[in-house]
């Protein structure tokens, strides 16, 4: 099982390439999958984690409209990616557009995946002023600190 953690600020070059932080490279592997993520970011999965996630999507009932829409969101946006010898990967133009990425991005390790955010969206979505309320709702889900 993969274990990504940490926060890294990077830039996308003129060709749409991003340097993957060295801490993530070995865990991510040479080939991986990038797709649309929730909250306007991108999700990056190592191949084995993607296969596990994809397997869970396959179990959703086809007759359920929300299940079809949820699966379509992740599967239609998915792109196989590779890392070059310099640790760079190309972020497909459609995914850059979805995540409103221009130049500055933030990569975050989220245990089983990496999230890539435009710097602006990261700041907008991740103010921690409501952390007490979030912690209370996590306790309702069975997670307590």
Annotate each predicted stretch with a short phrase.
Residues 1-10, 14, 24-81, 85, ...:
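Flexible "stalk/tail and boundary" regions
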